[in-house]
Amino acid sequence: MNKRIMYKFTRNFLNILNILIRFLILYLCYSGADVWNEEIPFNGNLSNGSPNLCQSGRHQSPINIMTKNLVYDHSLSTMEIEGLEKQLELVVENCGYDIRISLTGEFIQLNGGPSSYPYRIDFMQIKFGSASTQGSEHTIDGKAFPGELQIYAFNTELYNNFSDASYRPNGILAVSVFFKLGNATNKDLLGVVAAAEQTIFKGETFQLKGLELRSLLTSTHEFMTYEGSLPFPPCQETVTWIILNHPITITETELKTLRRLRVAHTLWSGSMADNFRPTQTINNRSVRTNINFRSSNEACDVRKQFSYIANIAHV
């Protein structure tokens, strides 16, 4: 009888111990916002920059944008994109801390906006949350969106590649597009999510063909802009950010697909969700916009009320 009791006790103890070990592995492998300050690799090399800039820099990204403090700048020109209609070839990769979408064929060039230089798109990244009330890196009046598409481009007039430009003045232009929760599917965003679903584990890649940027960048005329940094190590402060005023729609089903992505090579390694960096101190930087909210035109007031609604009441 005693042996039977001892056997049951031992078996139960081992089951509990196994659960605790699995929980510990999950905790240690999880790489969401709470452990963002660990050295996330940037091209596998931090030797040309200072990792400490992520903590000591005074022009870091992302930031919280207060709409009442926006500065209207009539000199900001419209951003133009050459190649919106092109059928792109992309490589979608699970980097562990992010989904990276790299252009492999056609060149897409950005002109205008806050810069007089031409910039070539190099790659895109997607930020998203474990719940639909969070996910974006930039926030508006303290409110987050369910996700954020970030498009990174480098200055082709001054530099040869993204890596070189990321350490140089006027090196990088980053375009941010917020996700807004809805029922309508954006066909090209759906294509990206479907490709990401083929890269569940870190290091997996998938080739995606036929994507057009014009459905991801539906409106580029209205934007906000500020000087900031790469939101990942080495956090170089060489980035001009453009935050588009109009979000694109993502469905809850698509978000659930993204949340299934893993940060390592096993199912229990934790979800990639909450891969956003916390907002950084603005340190007296100004955020300019080409939207004149002081205009008496009624459409401007409607735009402000609609476009800047984040997750106040489950968008």
Q: What is each stretch, according to the model?
A:
Residues 2-13, 17-315:
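Alpha-carbonic anhydrase
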